[in-house]
Amino acid sequence: MNLIPRTSIVVYLKHMKHERQIRKYGHIVHSNRDRKFVIMYVNEQDVDQIVHKLMQLKYVRHIDGSPYKYLKKTYEKEKHEIYN
């Protein structure tokens, strides 16, 4: 079984009724009706094409990418000095 690298994107919508049409572009993980956004996973190799297609839709306000792959994932134990 091969794992396909995926990344998350946040899609801000004008109306949440369009959430169903967004489903065909990726896997929706979370949606917030108050703030009108959807968090979805898409294949990493197809991100540019999917973002381009989503931006052409009239009910999409803007799209943010996930900063996860740029975050530091390994942490070293910090040494704290104790002052008396």
Swiss-Prot record:
Main location group: cytoplasm
GO cellular component term of the entry, any: cytoplasm
Keywords: Cytoplasm
InterPro entries associated with the record: DUF2129
Pfam families to which the protein is assigned, alphabetical: DUF2129
Coiled coil: none
Domain of life: Bacteria
Subcellular location as annotated: Cytoplasm
Family classification: Belongs to the UPF0298 family.
Protein name, as recorded: UPF0298 protein SAOUHSC_01072
